[in-house]
């Protein structure tokens, strides 16, 4: 079953948004996710958050630092990317300045990643240098079990505070609190997705709050534990259509193996 993904896309020149919002039914991995309904936060509150950037400094996806030289992100963020043209900014509340910028020496995504179903939407980047923990740079642990439905989690990233007619895109890190919805519940009649939710996914939901079109690949966290990776969704912050994330516990073995072998 093919999925129609409707996205709110802020048309941009370089890294600056022109302020026009439209809709697109393009391939899911073409989107650049943005936090919807979030609030300003600081990197000190979420020091594992990183920005994936082009050589020119344009933010295109989020990611999570899991050890001194490994970043976890979504597979769809890495498809078609040349390692020499991907950089990671760490330790900054702003995606366009501050912190440190590190080159990437290797990247990989799950060999079972399916751009049609969005199953196994996980990838990693190996940094060109080891990064020590500081006040604003911390490693996040990988969850071993998916939290129960109803557990409060936080999604972070850079993006708009609205879900329609977004006139500006703040450069400050955003956070939004949502509630975990396990994959079986998300695939049930209680929500609208049905059979397109798979066991490599986990959902999270709160009315008018979501991770949507730059936040792709970013963290869904409970405490200092990474439970999900921003993957896809139908529209943004839509009623009974939760945001869908790659389920870290389900993909943990691949992440650890790839981290050790790259």
Curated annotation (Swiss-Prot):
Cysteines engaged in disulfide bonds, as pairs: 61-77, 186-203, 212-236
Compartments, record wording: Secreted, Extracellular space
Family matches, as Pfam families: Trypsin
Subcellular location, principal: secreted
Domain Peptidase S1: 35-260
SMART domains in UniProt: Tryp_SPc
Propeptide residue span(s): 20-34
Active-site residues, as the UniProt record annotates them: 76, 121, 216
Annotated EC: 3.4.21.4
Keywords carried by this UniProt record: Disulfide bond, Hydrolase, Protease, Secreted, Serine protease, Signal, Zymogen
CDD domains named among the record's database cross-references: Tryp_SPc
GO cellular component, one term: extracellular region
Gene Ontology biological process terms in this record: proteolysis
Site, as annotated: Required for specificity: 210
One Gene Ontology MF term: serine-type endopeptidase activity
EC class (word): hydrolase
Signal sequence coordinates: 1-19
Substrates-to-products reaction catalysed: Preferential cleavage: Arg-|-Xaa, Lys-|-Xaa
Similarity comment: family membership: Belongs to the peptidase S1 family.
Protein name: Trypsin theta
Protein encoded by which gene: thetaTry
